[in-house]
Design a protein with these regions (language model features):
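Extended, helix-rich architectural segments
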Residues: 1-203
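Short, hydrophobic/amphipathic alpha-helical patches that form generic packing surfaces
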Residues: 30, 63-75, 276-287, 459-463, ...
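Structured, contiguous alpha/beta core segments that scaffold functional sites
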Residues: 12-13, 140-318
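Exposed alpha-helical structural elements
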Residues: 6, 65, 69, 96-99, ...
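C-terminal anchoring/interaction modules
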Residues: 1-30, 37, 300-550
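Charged, amphipathic alpha-helical segments
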Residues: 111-120, 205-216, 464-467
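Long, contiguous amphipathic alpha-helices that act as assembly "spine/axial" helices in icosahedral shell
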Residues: 48, 63, 96-140, 270-303, ...
Length: 550
């Protein structure tokens, strides 16, 4: 079996695994984000209307608020959102280490700003909020160092490794004949594509598969592209049965595939705001339709009229006249039934349903997070007002850290290291594994939930010290300051290290000791001078002392 045939077999198995999720995803897209899916490669550049099931846009607006709020609160390009650290906290007090980490963070931020990562992350957050699953490729780029490619839901298939994290991804997408030849070379494309190229059909779309999976057959010690930790193979879906476009590899898994919530061994996400709100979203469309029908019946009711004027012209415009025969008592045009125009109950129900959708999407919390970035709203205000929802988002944020942000930073760091874009680390850090600390608005808010306990404790001890000052002896102020600074995201460069504090205190103690010695010397001199000026009369103590010595 050729490599391509083996990969097509794997792809078929992955398609079967994903099949049960597709109807739910399609329904979510129909009511929230109709143009966000790509279940068929033929959907490229399709501009037909797809929002025919949406009457009330509350779900779409709430989803946009969630995406923007996560962008502002987790990975805002306007403020620092991560910090590198060493596993040993004492090492962070060493100035060369601290300065090296600061330079690396600055260069990584420059790479992020130069790349398209901040254009791709909003789609990642939208997908994970709507479909509970998202995927994003982080690739090397000669000009921008890294380049990201977000995958629309429906265009990729994933599988878990032994640790239940995603380590396999097959992506199905389209490329034009011109793009294929420019990317892979004319000698690597199928005979069908070569024929299209020769005949000038450069814009014809071709279905391509990109597969990334663990390279179980790699030869350890070899450094070539085919023996990396992860295998990468591009091939045409059709075309020659045994030809691939490119066979290479990656040193790190390049696909970030975060899930909102996962059930057991499932590969795809099992729950998210979009799934939770779907029932309310569908109910809202029905309520809006019923409200419109009721208003329509009031403003344009069904009418009844005498059969004798069936073929006559009837005027229903204001001021119009319709002539009727007067025979009979009921010869008039009138509504078939009178509709009561009270729609207040419907409006109240619509408002309640909208609030349910907003609550499912955490809209009020994410609106506050955006205000922090745009209006300098203090993080403490969010903590005080939305502490409960911050705690509810805790597991989601931890999963985002491990499945998205950690992998993004590790992948970017490794690419920069291979391109020699990082400074030489101090000798003390050679071979050391760094850790990442997140200091975004959301991360600070999560950590600062515990800051209030520190503040309450300090207030309690301060009040107690007014009655019993020795209570202050129980406070470890140095440790408290370090913990507080870390919780609220203060840069370590503006907090003095333990060595610096010890040196400052030693210098202060020496100065105080010198001042005490000088003061004691001055007091001794003053005492001697006073003693020398004392008169030696017979009744003085000095005379008695002098006499006693004779």
């Amino acid at each position: 079996m050729s490599l391509k045939q083996d990969l097509l077999k794997q792809l078929s198995q992955l398609k079967n695994e994903r099949q049960s999720f597709e109807p739910h995803w399609k329904e979510l897209a129909e009511y929230t984000r109709p143009r966000s899916t790509r279940f068929n490669t033929s959907e490229v550049n399709r501009g037909d209307r797809r929002n025919t099931k949406i009457i009330d846009q509350e779900a779409a607006k709430s989803e946009r608020t969630l995406s923007s709020g996560m962008m502002s609160g987790i990975t805002s390009p306007a403020r620092k959102w991560f910090r590198l650290a060493t596993p040993d906290p004492d090492m962070m007090n060493y100035s060369p280490v601290k300065m090296w980490l600061e330079v690396v963070e600055q260069r990584m931020n420059e790479v992020f700003n130069r790349s398209n990562i901040y254009q791709s992350l909003p789609q990642t957050y939208s997908d994970i909020g709507t479909f509970a699953t998202s995927a994003l490729a982080v690739l090397e780029d000669n000009e921008r160092v890294i380049r990201t490619v977000p995958f629309p839901i429906g265009s990729y298939y994933i599988a878990n490794g032994p640790d239940l994290t995603v380590d396999t991804c097959f992506r199905e997408f389209s490329m034009t004949v011109r793009q294929l030849v420019m990317e892979f070379g004319l000698g690597n494309v199928s005979e069908q594509v070569k024929s299209m190229w020769d005949s000038g059909n450069y814009s014809q779309w071709i279905t391509v598969i990109h597969s990334v999976y663990p390279n179980l057959n790699r030869i350890s010690g070899k450094m070539d592209a085919k023996n990396k930790l992860f295998k990468s193979v591009y091939f045409e879906m059709g075309g020659d049965s045994d030809r691939v476009l490119r066979e290479s590899g990656f040193d790190e898994f390049p696909i970030m595939a975060p899930r909102w919530e996962v059930n057991g061994e499932d590969v795809y996400g099992s729950s998210c705001p979009g799934m939770i709100a779907l029932g309310s979203v569908k109910a809202l469309q029905l309520l809006q339709r019923r409200k419109a029908q009721q208003i329509d019946k009031v403003t344009n009711p069904p009418m009844q009229a005498p059969a004798s004027i069936k073929n006559q012209r009837i005027s229903l415009v204001p001021g119009g006249i319709t002539y009727l025969p007067m025979a009979g008592a009921d010869q008039m045009i009138k509504p078939i039934f009178q509709v009561q125009a009270d729609i207040n109950g419907l409006i109240a129900d619509i408002g309640d349903t909208r609030n349910q959708i907003k609550e499912a999407y955490f809209s009020d919390l994410f609106m506050m997070l955006q205000n922090i970035n745009t209006r300098s709203m203090p993080v403490e205000a969010v903590i005080e007002m939305k502490e409960e929802k911050l705690l509810m988002l805790g597991p989601v944020l931890q999963r985002l850290d491990s499945e998205l942000l950690d992998k993004l930073i590790n992948r970017t760091f490794a690419i920069m290291a291979r391109k020699n874009l990082l400074p030489v680390p101090p000798e003390e850090m050679q071979g050391m594994q760094l850790k990442v600390e997140y200091i975004s608005v959301m991360a600070q808010a999560q950590k600062s939930v515990g800051v209030s306990s520190i503040e309450r404790f300090v207030g309690f001890v301060g009040g107690l010290a007014q009655m019993k000052p020795e209570a202050l002896d129980k406070l470890n102020t140095d440790e408290m300051i370090d913990n507080y600074a870390e919780s609220i995201g203060v840069s370590p460069t503006i907090v003095s290290s333990n060595d610096q504090v010890a040196a400052i205190r030693q210098q202060r103690a020496e100065q105080q000791q010198q001042m005490q010695q000088m003061q004691m010397a001055q007091e001794a001199v003053a005492g001697a001078q006073a003693l020398g000026n004392t008169p030696m009369d017979d009744n003085s103590a000095l005379a008695a002392l002098a006499g006693g010595g004779q």
